[in-house]
Amino acid sequence: TWSMLQLMWIKKHEPEVMEKAARAMFVKDYVRYQLTGVWTTDHVEAQGSLLFDNINWCWSEDLCRMSGIPISILPPLVKPTDISGHITAEASAITGIRAGTPVINGATDTALEAYCVGAIHENNCVTKLATSGTIYLFRKEAHPDPKALTYSHVVDGLWYTCLATSSAAESLRWYRDTFCKAEFAQELQGGKNTYRTLDEEAEKVPAGCEGLFFHPYLMGERSPYWDTKLRASFIGATAHHGRGHFNRAVLEGVALSIKDNFSLIENTVPIHEVRIVGGGGKSPLWRSIMANVLNRPILKYANDDSSYGSALL
């Protein structure tokens, strides 16, 4: 994401590297290049680079010129569903995959996670509880918004508006690693899953945590505030609050942060339900909190991994 800025940093701080650069690749495209020897990327990935022209559907010569990025190092563009190449004999010898096996181009994790949970129609909505948290709405036309990100989908004719909070499941991981070290050490020795323990304690606490609130701005915040200086905090703590309150406050704080973003799109089209993906969605309690905060049914699917979505393509 935002590869233009990364390439500009390299150009400024490591100019000798940029001078030698012949090809720029996204991570998945590099893996596919090693498998097939073919250098391509997809439009969804390209849009996230900030170097793509959404009007003419190609790399932007103007943006490349303004940023100083040679357009010649950017890969050819193909559809996510297109076959980019085939497994080479060399790759077959290393991986065991049959030589000649076709390899599709693929797309970004977000687009493929949405695809594998059936977000393929207008007005479908998906939320993601991973390191960061997202909420995205699919529509037939692009709706650019200065507070949001806009991408095309892997399904022709669909676009999605993407809004993101920077620390979703990352907030819970930070909380576990910082305040539950003993439990986590036991888990690593074959003991009970720490997240399950935290959920069980949080389930005993009423909604609202009896006045305890958590702001999940551990790494600043993206939408809707776009402020790197925002900071996380627990507010309203009293002697009455126990660990279960703090556990639940983290879950509720993340859900409310996603609600901040959802409020920008929830009244634009009818949204009857929200599909959920990501590791945080494995928690029944967190799903319940999300359903209450968003005031929508939350749909959980057995398979919601981007690799599964790529296989479906």
Model region roles, listed by residue range:
Residues 46, 131-133, 302-305:
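Short, acidic/turn-prone active-site loops that include or flank metal/cofactor-
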Residues 172, 308-313:
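Short, small-residue alpha-helix embedded
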Residues 1-108, 172, 216-219, 247:
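Gly/Ser/Thr-rich active-site cleft segment
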Residues 116-122, 264-266, 293, 313:
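Alpha-helix C-terminal capping segments
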Residues 51-159, 166-167, 183, 189-196, ...:
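ATP-dependent carbohydrate kinase catalytic cores
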Residues 4, 8-14, 20, 33, ...:
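A short helix-loop
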Residues 204-308:
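Activation-segment/catalytic-loop signature of the eukaryotic protein kinase fold
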